[in-house]
Regions:
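Surface-exposed short loop/turn segments
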Residues: 12, 74-125, 135-140
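A structural "domain/chain start" motif
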Residues: 8-60, 128-132, 161-164
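A short amphipathic beta-strand at an alpha->beta junction
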Residues: 30, 69-71
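Sec-exported extracytoplasmic/periplasmic mature domains
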Residues: 60-68, 93, 158-163
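Soluble non-cytosolic domains of exported or imported proteins
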Residues: 46-57, 105, 140-151
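Short secondary-structure boundary motifs at beta->alpha junctions and helix caps
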Residues: 121-163
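Sec-dependent bacterial lipoprotein signal peptides
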Residues: 1-9
Length: 164
């Protein structure tokens, strides 16, 4: 009876919205990927640092084979740079093992914020997308955990960079 009472309490949410479409990225030879949290209540949470490190690696690895940029997070020759900035505004960490083994005790995994493409010199935003990922409990132990949400944000970032 406890199992039935806990299941189906919250729904999974996976939403994104293009808030500023990208016109062209042809003028950028170099990219810098940065990930930040909005405020101490986000950045001091358990799992935040690990999440940003994994997300940074995945985004850089996803961008590199596209050939869009000569360098990513490296030295540049003075030509224009594009900052791929992720601002995390909502966050709650849930690990994969916790989701699998103790899903009925795990809270919803939450990862939300903004993906901004900025001209590094002027600070002008040349593309922007908002996103929110919440795990819910309808899929029980198969619900998303933070690692799956990182993969979704990586895919959204790549989509923003490559869709014109």
């Amino acid at each position: 009876a406890l199992f039935v009472g806990l299941a189906g309490c919250t729904e999974q949410v996976s939403q994104f919205q293009l808030t500023r479409p990208v016109s062209s990225l042809n003028s950028y030879q170099h990219a810098i990927v940065s990930i930040h949290g909005e405020g101490l209540d986000i950045t001091t949470q358990y799992g935040f640092r690990e999440t940003t490190e994994v997300m940074h690696k995945k985004i850089v690895s996803a961008i590199r084979p596209t050939g869009l940029f000569n360098t990513i997070n490296g030295d540049h020759d003075g030509s224009s740079q594009l900052e791929v900035a992720i601002l995390i505004t909502e966050f709650r960490y849930v690990s994969g093992p916790k989701r699998s083994l103790a899903w009925f005790f795990a809270n919803d995994a939450i990862l939300g914020g903004l993906i901004q493409l900025k001209d590094k010199d002027s600070g002008k935003i040349v593309g922007e997308m908002s996103f929110i990922e919440k795990s819910g409990d309808q899929k029980a132990m198969l619900s998303d955990y933070t690692g799956k949400q990182i993969n979704k944000v990586t895919n959204l970032t790549l989509a923003l960079l490559t869709t014109i």
